[in-house]
């Protein structure tokens, strides 16, 4: 959940449900800052049980950010920049427990990018960036969603446009080598 004050300060918070979404309970703030705007956060649970929050930002040069909970979502560490631009982010666990992180790149050349992180998502600053597409028409792209097709193939779908044209949903099939 994202919230905003009259002064424009934003924060994101964790809400939990123990009855499949019928009722929700407030857990804790994930990230807040006096100048950085947070929104469109995705969560990922690591094999060790950490909850990793991948945060979209504004007023921070579109930097991807991360925060981590090591206590089951009762609290999160101070957010930090991941060292690259891209948003919103989406994580998918691979069969070998590595993590495919997908995101839109909303700067020239506009496109869709991925990184493969270690199982605990601790190597985000050094994981190589892989460009899936760099032919977007403008910055109105992204919202990736990766899905395992089988153990070696992933379909990454996303919102896209070419030459500032009609917006559409497109996809790229990746082959993962282990």
Describe the residue ranges of each PLM region:
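Asp-box/BNR beta-propeller blade signature and adjacent active/binding-site loops
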Residues: 1-178
């Amino acid at each position: 959940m994202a919230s905003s004050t009259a002064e424009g300060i934003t924060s994101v918070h964790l809400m939990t449900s123990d009855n499949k979404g019928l009722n929700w309970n407030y857990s804790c703030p994930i990230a807040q800052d006096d100048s950085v705007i947070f929104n469109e956060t995705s969560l990922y649970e690591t094999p060790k049980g950490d909850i990793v929050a991948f945060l979209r930002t504004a007023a921070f040069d579109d930097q991807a950010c991360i925060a981590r909970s090591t206590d089951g979502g009762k609290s999160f560490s101070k957010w930090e920049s991941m060292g690259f631009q891209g948003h919103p982010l989406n994580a998918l666990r691979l069969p070998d427990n590595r993590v495919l992180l997908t995101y839109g790149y909303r700067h020239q050349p506009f496109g869709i990018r991925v990184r493969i992180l270690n199982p605990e998502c601790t190597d985000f600053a050094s994981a190589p960036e892989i460009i899936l597409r760099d032919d977007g028409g403008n910055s109105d792209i992204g919202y990736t969603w990766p899905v395992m097709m089988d153990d070696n193939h992933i379909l990454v779908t996303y919102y896209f446009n070419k030459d500032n044209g009609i917006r559409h949903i497109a996809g790229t099939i990746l082959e993962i080598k282990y």
